[in-house]
Amino acid sequence: MGKETIDAAILAHRGWVSRIKTGFDGINTEHFDLASTVDHDACDLAWWLRKDESRNLLGPEAREHIQKIHERFHQLCGLLGAQLNQRTAGPQHNELLAELDAISKEIVQILLQARDKEA
């Protein structure tokens, strides 16, 4: 995952958070494909995490950690996307949004550290 790929992954994660948040703000009215939204193995980040390069840049503990939080990130996107598809905010949507935002920031921080190691 070169610098450009890491930057693209960062933008993609920020994009997910923005799409979800603007959905609850009524700005984004898209319908979420929940099957692809929850599939944490289908995105570029998951592909990179399966490669040796990620192990070398992250180390085994950070790599395992980012894999776990990345999976949770996609679960949250699915839960929130389902609420948006139904045009209803669940009782815990604020907590889910806060968790999504926190996980996204943590993923970005880990990716920035990996990018800086590669430079």
Model-assigned labels for residue ranges:
Residues 1-119:
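N-terminal membrane-sensor/transducer module of prokaryotic signaling receptors
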